[in-house]
């Protein structure tokens, strides 16, 4: 399945300004916080998790939380999509790929899960 999400970097900036680190901790793990170096990268992580949940066909909710979706970086700085053991088992995931981009005030992510 394929999931896509786009988010305004300005929207993420406003949420971060209003709620500070509480906003970030709502959807990012400690390791992911280290990847959140700019508002654009934070927006990319948000879009990535939303896209991954859509690729599962459920969205963010009871079946799949933000913390069931894990975003890492390869040595070449490419995004790596992983899931919690529960998600791998419940959705029988064999492979997952992710692309994130940001330009013109938006971040977009595409996730493919099979």
Swiss-Prot record:
Q: Which reaction does it catalyse?
A: apo-[ACP] + CoA = holo-[ACP] + adenosine 3',5'-bisphosphate + H(+)
Q: Give the enzyme's main class according to its UniProt record, as a single word.
A: transferase
What's the EC number here? 2.7.8.7
Required co-factor(s) are: Mg(2+)
Question: Which Gene3D superfamilies does the UniProt entry name for this protein?
Answer: 4'-phosphopantetheinyl transferase domain
Superkingdom classification of source = Bacteria
UniProt: Mg(2+) binding residues: 5, 50
**GO BP field:** fatty acid biosynthetic process
InterPro entries for this protein? 4-PPantetheinyl_Trfase_dom, 4-PPantetheinyl_Trfase_dom_sf, ACPS, Ppantetheine-prot_Trfase_dom
One molecular function GO term is: magnesium ion binding
Tell whether Chaperone is among the UniProt keywords: no
Tell me, in one coarse class, where this protein mainly resides: cytoplasm
Listed GO CC annotations: cytoplasm
**Localization per record:** Cytoplasm
Q: Which NCBIfam families match?
A: acpS, pantethn_trn
Q: Would you identify the family this protein belongs to, as annotated?
A: Belongs to the P-Pant transferase superfamily. AcpS family.
Task: Say what the protein does.
Answer: Transfers the 4'-phosphopantetheine moiety from coenzyme A to a Ser of acyl-carrier-protein.
The name on file for this protein is Holo-[acyl-carrier-protein] synthase
* Protein species of origin: Campylobacter curvus (strain 525.92)
